[in-house]
Every structure is written in C-alpha cells, then in structure tokens.
C-alpha cells in the first residue's frame, strides 16, 4: 500500500495520499479475450484531486497507455517503469502478484511527481471509469464533459452499493472484515438488539442502538471524512466476470488470483 505525506506551502495542513492496487480479477473468463484487471483505490486530502476518494478497475494495457501519455507530456521528467510484460515468475498466481506490486510501485512514484500529477489524463485514469478513447476525447475538448465533470459524475454514482453492502454484511456475520476497500459504511451503527421476551411488554423500556466504538478508518487521522460510499466493481461488464474466490494467496495483506496454466498465455499479454 502506498502512503506518504507532504506539507502544503502554507505549512498549515499535511497532504496525505493513499493508493492501493489490489483485488486482481479475470474478466471474460473462458473466452479468447480474457484478461486481468486490478482495483485502484485512492484516498487523499490533496487539493490536486477533484475527488478525495475514488475506486476504479484498470487493466495492464491501460497502464501501458498511461505511461506513454505521461512520458509524452512530461518532457525531460523521467516516468517510472512498469512491470515487465512477459516475465514469468514460476506460477500464474505468483506472476499476477508480482505485477500487482509493480503497478502499485509505478503509481506511488507517479503521484510523488508534481509534474506528472498535473496531467489531466492521470486524474481521469485514477478517478473515472472512462475508457482510453473517452479519456483522450475529454482532455482534447471533444467530449460533452470536462475533466472535473467526468470525475464528479463517477464519484457521485452509487451503482453497486446495495450488492456491496449485502456482501459485506455477509462477511461481517461470519466475523470477517469487509474484503472490498471501497465499501464505506454509512454510519457506525449496527442493528439494535431485540428486547428479551420477558420485557417485550414493558413499553417504558427504551432500547438504544449499539454504536461501534471503533469506526473503520485509513492510516492517517488527517484524512478528510468520506462523504459518500463508493464501489468500483460496477466499472466493468458483469458478464463473464469471475471473482475467483478459491485458493487465494495473501501476500502483505493483498490477494493474488490463481490462473490455470492454460489461461496464462492468453491473459498475460493483455
């Protein structure tokens, strides 16, 4: 997980940027055009960003496009390297985990550069689910939306919230933590317990809701409050999507997705 602080010019507020690349998934599994995409979660109080919290899914091919655009606009400023395209690490799940780590390292370095951070294409890549042609049209003024409009429209969307809430409730019922970093509870309240049968008829008894003593938060207390729930699982088509819940290997708290050896040749180059 990427996390760093930077003092603003007036030294009054510490800028915090948290970025995570995680939850690799195989899209269109079983077809000739299957590929792996990754969840990118970003939370910040930096004024450079339109939305303070965002969550999108991007594939490796889109990272390659982003780096080319950043290099074109950055001039002599060096752009971080991406993980290799055809390097094998023994097993498929190990390869995907190495790639995930490489993509996160790439974004961490990019977001530390003031020059690269000023590129509008980077912001649309991180904070909207626009495709590559749509991003190019937006920054070139060939779209009906401005860059800020596209980011805010995506940030205000609550699509997939009900499904994410149900899944999280199911995990919590089993004593687990929510798996999606984008699930943000609307409040710290749980359902109020029902009164014991012996006291159900006592109308003078008041049952107050139970409030969690610990509210989920990110690493830094300086981060601004999250105003609206976000879920990035709706950015990709639902058809042919596999969450691959079986046998995931945890490395540093993130999860790598195992692939069958037969799938590796069609997936790794995408």
Curated annotation (Swiss-Prot):
GO molecular function per UniProt: phosphatidylinositol phosphate binding
Keywords (A to Z) from UniProt: Cell membrane, Cytoplasm, Endosome, Lipid-binding, Membrane, Protein transport, Transport
Keyword Glycoprotein: no
GO cellular component, one term: endosome
Keyword Protein transport belongs to the record: yes
Binding-site positions, a 1,2-diacyl-sn-glycero-3-phospho-(1D-myo-inositol-3-phosphate): 59, 85, 99
SUPFAM superfamilies, A to Z: PX domain
Membrane topology: Peripheral membrane protein
Domain PX intervals: 16-132
Region (Disordered): 168-203
InterPro entries attached to this UniProt entry: PX_dom, PX_dom_sf, SNX10/11
Origin: domain of life: Eukaryota
Entry domain remark: The PX domain mediates interaction with membranes enriched in phosphatidylinositol 3-phosphate.
Function: Phosphoinositide-binding protein involved in protein sorting and membrane trafficking in endosomes. Regulates the levels of TRPV3 by promoting its trafficking from the cell membrane to lysosome for degradation.
Name of the protein in question: Sorting nexin-11
Lineage, top ranks: Eukaryota, Metazoa, Chordata, Craniata, Vertebrata
């Amino acid at each position: 997980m990427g996390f760093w602080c930077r003092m603003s010019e007036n030294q009054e507020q510490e800028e915090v940027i948290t970025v995570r690349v995680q939850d690799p998934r195989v899209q269109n599994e079983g077809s000739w055009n299957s590929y792996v995409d990754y969840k990118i979660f970003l939370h910040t109080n930096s004024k450079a960003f339109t939305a303070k919290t965002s969550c999108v899914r991007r594939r490796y091919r889109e990272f390659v496009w982003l780096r080319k655009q950043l290099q074109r606009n950055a001039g002599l400023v060096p752009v971080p390297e991406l993980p290799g395209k055809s390097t094998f690490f023994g097993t498929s799940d190990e390869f995907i985990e190495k790639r995930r780590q490489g993509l996160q390292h790439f974004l961490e370095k990019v977001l530390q550069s003031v020059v690269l951070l000023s590129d509008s294409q980077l912001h649309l890549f991180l904070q909207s689910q626009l495709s590559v042609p749509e991003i190019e049209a937006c920054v070139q003024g060939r779209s009906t939306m401005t860059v800020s409009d596209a980011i805010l429209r995506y940030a205000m969307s609550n699509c997939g919230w009900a499904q994410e809430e149900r899944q999280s409730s199911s995990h919590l019922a089993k004593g687990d933590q929510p798996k999606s970093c984008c699930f943000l509870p609307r409040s710290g309240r749980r359902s109020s317990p029902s009164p014991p049968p012996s006291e159900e008829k006592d109308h003078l008894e008041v049952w107050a809701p139970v409030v969690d003593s610990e509210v989920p938060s990110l690493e830094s207390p300086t981060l601004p409050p999250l105003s609206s729930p976000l879920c990035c699982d709706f950015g990709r088509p639902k058809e042919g999507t596999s969450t691959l819940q079986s046998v995931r290997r945890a490395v540093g708290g993130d999860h790598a997705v195992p692939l069958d050896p037969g799938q590796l040749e069609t997936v790794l180059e995408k």
